[in-house]
Curated annotation (Swiss-Prot):
Protein name: tRNA uridine(34) hydroxylase
Chain's gene name: trhO
UniProt KW keywords: Oxidoreductase, tRNA processing
Active-site residues, as the UniProt record annotates them: 178
GO BP of this protein: tRNA modification
Entry's Gene Ontology molecular function annotations: oxidoreductase activity, acting on paired donors, with incorporation or reduction of molecular oxygen
């Protein structure tokens, strides 16, 4: 039986002074280790998802951590029968997840994590609203039953939605959700920076939630859109046929 392909996703908000200098080093080790996927680098940190053998994706992650020196890294691994990526790309970006808000400090302002095992209980409490920070085409594939969708085409539209919906958010305990954790973490940072106090987010995102809970309480409906060749995954994180969506 052939070895399963490991898919490792990792991000960290950490100051990187010269991110462009890291590109050739990461490309070199990634190609040597037959790893495929995408790593985004910016002054605010890194965000990557790449596939290969379990040993090799972890070696690439170790190099990434060594080069950037973060205090905390959000990491998750799941498995596939085939590579979900075609090749390795390392790209320089202005932001590792583009929101277009100048001066946002995610280390200084961010919400409180809710562990996947505690998520169902938390979001069914009084005065809690769930905001799905993903784009409309992702939400159409699947979301939490109680979630509110901002109906954005891109994450850059999210700050404007927040500005227009202050009445909806005022006085609420706001629970943010996204695919792997990075967008909801940055979303909580935005809300905290403009004065919202009770802001929370699902640790590890929807993918970690499905892995840890298997959607046992059926609060999640549909499949989870992913940005690789699988396109969408079911409760058990297996690819879902028929969700070859355009984006």
């Amino acid at each position: 039986m052939s070895e399963k392909i490991a898919i490792l996703s990792a991000y960290s908000f950490v100051n990187i002074e010269e991110p462009a200098n890291l590109i050739p080093k990461l490309l070199l080790i990634g190609k040597r280790k037959y790893v495929r996927g995408t790593i985004l680098l910016a002054n605010e940190g890194f965000n990557g998802s790449f596939s290969g053998s379990y040993e090799n994706v972890n070696l690439v992650l170790e190099e990434l951590i060594k080069l950037t020196g973060p205090k905390d890294v959000n990491v998750k691994i799941n498995y596939s029968d085939v590579h979900p990526f075609q090749k390795l790309k390392v790209r320089l970006k202005k932001e590792i997840v583009a929101m277009n808000v100048e001066g946002l400090n995610v280390d200084l302002f961010k919400g409180e994590y809710i562990e996947p095992k505690d998520w169902d209980e938390f979001i069914t409490k009084q005065n809690v609203i769930v905001i799905d920070t993903r784009n409309d085409y992702e939400v159409e594939v699947g979301t939490f039953k109680s979630a509110i969708s901002p109906n954005t085409k891109t994450f850059k539209q999210f700050p404007a939605w927040v500005q227009k919906n202050q009445g909806l958010l005022k006085g609420k305990r706001i629970a943010m959700v996204c695919t792997g954790g990075i967008r909801c973490e940055k979303s909580t940072s935005l809300l905290k920076s403009i004065g919202y106090d009770e802001v929370y987010h699902l640790k590890g995102g929807i993918l970690q939630y499905l892995e840890d809970t298997q959607n046992k309480n059926n609060l999640w409906q549909g499949a989870c859109f992913v940005f690789d060749d699988r396109r969408a995954v079911a409760d058990d994180l297996s690819p879902v046929a028929g969700h070859w969506l355009q984006r």
